[in-house]
């Protein structure tokens, strides 16, 4: 298994050292792990194996040496042989241990030439296993207590057996004729083998329960992740639905109010234009009247001057009067043109601009309203045809598939596992009672035989 496929997190050096020291591995320091040596890693792995598996490499080698004897070894090769055998046994045990905790590629190089990154990865696997073991230890307390009780009873039976063996040996020393027959000894050995088989079965049951519980936990986490993803989708769809409802309920009213205000403003500006037009017409009529009066006065004066012609003084006065009248006319025209006409032109331009803006705004409003209606209709159709079926389908899927299906299935599997476990426990209790009966029967027979 490659590093990217590991089922456990790779810890940094500081956290790794803290976790290992909390597990009573005092040798674990940042300096030793960052620059590992062969002797250091061999010593640390021996402590890990002895702590988690209860196996001592030295004790295995000592027992093996006692069984095989050292006579076949030469004196100069004995130390080399023992060191090599020590590393081989440690490598085999470490390979099996790391394989059980999720590392498939442990090899001899990790003992002879350890690398910092691989060492950090292997020790991270050990910490992850220790955490999982500590978390699951509470679930296995009842099994551990039962196993300890059975082991205590088994040790008691072995002690009884050893006591009987000692008594038999004493009787053999006293009287060589009182030797148990071979059939009874063979029967006793078979019973011991049955006890060992029962112990192995209990160990396998414990491992199977741990694996089943881990699978159940993984399945539960996967279902929770699916439910979380579906919840996010539902929240997003509900948010989009609320936005569509807000657009359909709010924007049309605001547009209608805006159009109404603009229409009122247009009516007001038209009324102002009509008033100004009427004032302009009145002023034009006044100017026309003044022009008529001036023309008539000029004609009268001209007739008078042509009829009288008495003196140049009178003519000069008439010319001056005419000039004054002309000046007054020009002044009046200038006043009209520069005052009221200028204001009328400004108001006319403003009115034309407002009319153009109003017309453009009305067109834009109509176009925007049409686009909003079209978009709202499309969104409504899309919601009805796509989003709502998905929401309904999601609700049905959550209700039927996840809640009613997978969770019920997992509950059924858990109940079935509990039933199977209870059946196996009952079978073990029955076998244990039978075994106890056989041992008691054997003890009674041995006592009767010795008496």
Swiss-Prot record:
GO cellular component, one term: Ndc80 complex
Effect of substituting residue 383 to C: Temperature-sensitive
Gene Ontology MF terms: protein-containing complex binding
UniProt similarity note: Belongs to the NUF2 family.
Alphabetical list of Gene3D superfamilies matching this protein: 1.20.5.340, Ncd80 complex, Nuf2 subunit
Coiled-coil portions: 153-291, 341-371, 398-432
Keywords from the UniProt entry: Cell cycle, Cell division, Centromere, Chromosome, Coiled coil, Kinetochore, Mitosis, Nucleus
Something else known: Present with 1550 molecules/cell in log phase SD medium.
Function as written in the Swiss-Prot or TrEMBL entry: Acts as a component of the essential kinetochore-associated NDC80 complex, which is involved in chromosome segregation and spindle checkpoint activity.
Effect listed in the UniProt record for changing residue 446 to L: Temperature-sensitive
Assembly information from the UniProt record: Component of the NDC80 complex, which consists of TID3/NDC80, NUF2, SPC24 and SPC25. The NDC80 complex is formed by two subcomplexes, TID3/NDC80-NUF2 and SPC24-SPC25, which are joined end-to-end through their coiled-coil domains. It has a rod-like structure with a length of 570 Angstroms and globular domains at either end. The TID3/NDC80-NUF2 globular domains are probably directed to microtubules, the SPC24-SPC25 globular domains to the centromere.
Domain of life: Eukaryota
Alphabetical GO biological process terms: attachment of mitotic spindle microtubules to kinetochore; cell division; chromosome segregation; kinetochore organization; meiotic chromosome segregation; mitotic spindle organization
Effect of mutating residue 410 to S: Temperature-sensitive
Pfam families (UniProt xref): Nuf2
Result after altering residue 338 to P: Temperature-sensitive
Protein name: Kinetochore protein NUF2
InterPro entries, sorted: Kinetochore_Nuf2_N, Nuf2_N_sf
PANTHER family assigned to the protein according to its UniProt record, in alphabetical order: KINETOCHORE PROTEIN NUF2 (PTHR21650:SF2), MEMBRALIN/KINETOCHORE PROTEIN NUF2 (PTHR21650)
Species for this entry: Saccharomyces cerevisiae (strain ATCC 204508 / S288c)
Protein location: Nucleus; Chromosome, Centromere, Kinetochore
């Amino acid at each position: 298994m490659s590093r990217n496929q590991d089922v456990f997190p790779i810890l940094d050096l500081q956290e790794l050292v803290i976790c290992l020291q909390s597990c009573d591995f005092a040798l674990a320091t940042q300096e030793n792990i960052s620059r590992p040596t062969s002797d250091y890693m061999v010593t640390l792995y021996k402590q890990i194996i002895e702590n988690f598996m209860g196996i001592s490499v030295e004790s295995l080698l000592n027992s093996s040496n006692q069984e095989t004897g050292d006579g076949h070894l030469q004196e100069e090769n004995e130390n080399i042989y023992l060191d090599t055998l020590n590393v081989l046994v440690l490598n085999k045990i470490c390979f099996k241990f790391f394989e059980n905790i999720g590392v498939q590629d442990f090899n001899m190089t990790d003992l002879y030439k350890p690398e910092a990154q691989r060492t950090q990865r292997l020790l991270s696997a050990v910490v992850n296993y220790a955490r999982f073991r500590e978390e699951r230890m509470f679930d296995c307390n009842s099994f551990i207590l039962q196993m300890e009780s059975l082991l205590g009873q088994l040790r008691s039976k072995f002690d009884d057996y050893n006591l009987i063996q000692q008594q038999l040996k004493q009787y053999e020393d006293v009287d060589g004729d009182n030797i148990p027959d071979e059939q009874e000894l063979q029967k006793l050995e078979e019973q011991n083998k049955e006890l060992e088989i029962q112990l192995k079965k209990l160990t396998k049951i414990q491992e199977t329960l741990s694996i089943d519980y881990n699978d159940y936990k993984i399945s539960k986490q996967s279902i929770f992740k699916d439910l979380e993803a579906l919840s996010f989708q539902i929240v997003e769809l509900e948010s989009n639905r609320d936005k569509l409802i807000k657009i359909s309920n709010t924007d049309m009213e605001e547009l209608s109010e805006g159009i109404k205000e603009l229409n009122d403003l247009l009516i007001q500006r038209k009324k102002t234009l009509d008033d100004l037009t009427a004032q302009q017409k009145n002023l034009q009529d006044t100017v026309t009247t003044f022009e008529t009066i001036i023309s008539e006065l000029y004609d009268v004066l001209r007739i008078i001057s042509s009829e009288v012609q008495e003196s140049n003084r009178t003519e000069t006065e008439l010319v001056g009067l005419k000039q004054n009248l002309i000046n007054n006319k020009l002044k009046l025209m200038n006043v009209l043109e520069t005052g009221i006409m200028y204001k009328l032109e400004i108001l006319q331009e403003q009115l034309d601009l407002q009319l153009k803006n109003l017309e453009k705004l009305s067109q834009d409003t109509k176009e925007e309203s049409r686009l909003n209606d079209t978009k709202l209709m499309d969104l409504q159709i899309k919601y009805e045809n796509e989003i709502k079926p998905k929401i309904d389908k999601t609700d049905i899927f959550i209700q039927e598939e996840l809640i009613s299906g997978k969770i019920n299935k997992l509950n059924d599997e858990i109940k079935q596992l509990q039933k199977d476990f209870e059946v196996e426990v009952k079978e073990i209790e029955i076998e244990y009672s039978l075994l106890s009966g056989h041992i008691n029967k054997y003890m009674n027979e041995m006592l009767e035989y010795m008496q």
